[in-house]
Amino acid sequence: MLHRFLWASTLSLLATGPVFAMCTDCDFSGQNLAFADFRDQDLSGANFSDAYLIDAKFDGANLEGADFSGARANNTTFRNARLSDVRFVGAELELADFSGARMAGVDFNDAFVRHSKLTKDQALQSNYCQVPLRDATARGTLCE
């Protein structure tokens, strides 16, 4: 029954587009939010740990202090998002797009970051260059 409810809530989210104009400290941990549209939402302090976020959109969102630990966020976009103090510990971020995102204090410890759009300035603002990562591509050029 719970599984059906979670699936229905995911479908509702997909059908209506952005529905959380402001959802600070919300708990989305472990949820299937593939293709979810969180563009321009205030999700500061939200918990997305262990969530399935494939192809989700967080463009322009305020995610300051959010937790994405263990999340699968492949092909997810964070364009122009506010990501200060976000935790991506152990997250999968293959093909993630961080274009224009503010990333001061972002924690990438043990994250899988591959083929993602990340600038040298963003890498230096976060701990990207100081922590162990799983198969980070282009790390050498960003951290030199």
Which residues make up each language-model segment?
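Bacterial N-terminal signal peptides that target proteins for export
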Residues: 1-9
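Bacterial N-terminal signal peptides
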Residues: 8-16
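Tandem repeat scaffolds
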Residues: 17-144
